[in-house]
Amino acid sequence: MPQLGMGELLIILIIVLLLFGASRITGVASALGGSIKAFRKAVRDDDVPASKSEPAESTDKKVETNV
């Protein structure tokens, strides 16, 4: 697979800017950044309650099964 150099990446960036426009690209990038930030916050918030949760009930309870 061929490697892309700086010149090729610059040409691709110019073509993308011409096709979509700068305002649409900045809007998409902003939405993507907000989504990543919300995801990281949700992952971080999930870890905090797990360490401070109440002790689990006894696991020695008998499990009823219908056969």
Swiss-Prot record:
One of its GO terms (biological process) is protein transport by the Tat complex. One of its GO terms (cellular component) is TAT protein transport complex. It comes from the Bacteria. Disulfide bonds: none annotated. GO terms for molecular function: protein transmembrane transporter activity. It is found in: Cell membrane. It is a single-pass membrane protein. InterPro entries: TatA/B/E, TatA/E. Keywords: Cell membrane, Membrane, Protein transport, Translocation, Transmembrane, Transmembrane helix, Transport. Residues 45-67 are annotated as: Disordered. Forms a complex with TatC. Part of the twin-arginine translocation (Tat) system that transports large folded proteins containing a characteristic twin-arginine motif in their signal peptide across membranes. TatA could form the protein-conducting channel of the Tat system. Belongs to the TatA/E family. This is Sec-independent protein translocase protein TatA. It comes from Roseiflexus sp. (strain RS-1). The gene is tatA.
